[in-house]
Amino acid sequence: GVGFKAGVKDYKLTYYTPEYQTKDTDILAAFRVTPQPGVPPEEAGAAVAAESSTGTWTTVWTDGLTSLDRYKGRCYHIEPVIGEENQYFCYVAYPLDLFEEGSVTNMFTSIVGNVFGFKALRALRLEDLRIPPAYSKTFQGPPHGIQVERDKLNKYGRPLLGCTIKPKLGLSAKNYGRAVYECLRGGLDFTKDDENVNSQPFMRWRDRFLFCAEAIYKSQAETGEIKGHYLNATAGTCEEMIKRAVFARELGVPIVMHDYLTGGFTANTTLAAYCRDNGLLLHIHRAMHAVIDRQKNHGMHFRVLAKALRMSGGDHIHSGTVVGKLEGDRQLTLGFVDLLRDDYIEKDRSRGIFFTQDWVSMPGVLPVASGGIHVWHMPALTEIFGDDSVLQFG
């Protein structure tokens, strides 16, 4: 005999381990699980742990060639979601060895990969991740961080002000640059390429970069302040993206921009490394986030995408407004804003923080309040976001 029986077997025999003591090096995940009718929560939680780590639907002889105990994910705690029928929070611990160092891409491929299409689950949402210092230390994180950015800009003790150039599509490069100049000359710290602006027929990227650089230098000379424009380097290939970042560096501008979800984490980490090596700040836009995070019972909460961005690298990230035109709950927003900026964040379920997170010395990211805000929102925004933020109007 081969020492095992073939056939479909229950996951909970192997992957549900309520007695497990989590290790400091484990990556911990909190999932909101909605099992199919008739599937017990233990089986559903164990299935999540299995499918996102070493498990497959049956036993195979090659299982005997490794130590599954060392490499398997473990569902170590399950609790019902208060106020929801047939929903459970399932906590899963993953051994550190399952993940490639310095790769957000690999981390997500494992934790939020095939398991989300799993038949035994009606829906699945990743609510939070605890990233241990042993793993976060394998990432560079933000190219510069909040403190270095303030030193570069020589602006302290207040939120930074920005606006997005509108109409976002259709202006020629020359007129676009003119709008940038007027905004910066009028007192803003930053202007921004809309995320839709890459390199379209009506305005190619190189022309835009040139006229925006001119606007920056002219307004700097006239105001005596350091100015910036988020030049969108997002492109169809990594090579093209880096080419745009190189051109921005050659122009001597202070900051470039990237859409990190549509561009992908591999491209984002590549760009962040380039920005760090070349003294460019990196502004991150989150186009596509609502596809992933808007459903309450399926997908991923934005706090997970925010943590992933801090690891991958970015100096600014759009993080909702609470008061503008787009959706966002106040307490939960404050929770992930702290996760972006602070070194050490205590577990606090009222703010959606499922785990205590210790970033040790990884630089912080400035949250950007953007999306349908105007001057009447100022008092609320400064109260919610405090000094370390970018208020992005328009």
Curated annotation (Swiss-Prot):
InterPro entries: RuBisCO (IPR033966), RuBisCo_large_chain_AS (IPR020878), RuBisCO_lsu_C (IPR000685), RuBisCO_lsu_C_sf (IPR036376), RuBisCO_lsu_fd_N (IPR017443), RuBisCO_lsu_N_sf (IPR036422). The disulfide bond which can form in the large chain dimeric partners within the hexadecamer appears to be associated with oxidative stress and protein turnover. It is an enzyme of class 4 (lyase). Keywords: Calvin cycle, Carbon dioxide fixation, Chloroplast, Disulfide bond, Lyase, Magnesium, Metal-binding, Methylation, Monooxygenase, Oxidoreductase, Photorespiration, Photosynthesis, Plastid. One of its GO terms (molecular function) is ribulose-bisphosphate carboxylase activity. It is found in: Plastid, Chloroplast. The modification N6-carboxylysine is found at residue 192. Binds 1 Mg(2+) ion per subunit. Substrate binds at residues 114, 164, 168, 286, 318, 370. RuBisCO catalyzes two reactions: the carboxylation of D-ribulose 1,5-bisphosphate, the primary event in carbon dioxide fixation, as well as the oxidative fragmentation of the pentose substrate in the photorespiration process. Both reactions occur simultaneously and in competition at the same active site. Heterohexadecamer of 8 large chains and 8 small chains; disulfide-linked. The disulfide link is formed within the large subunit homodimers. Belongs to the RuBisCO large chain family. Type I subfamily. NCBIfam families: PRK04208.1. This is Ribulose bisphosphate carboxylase large chain. The lineage of its organism: Eukaryota, Viridiplantae, Streptophyta, Embryophyta, Tracheophyta.
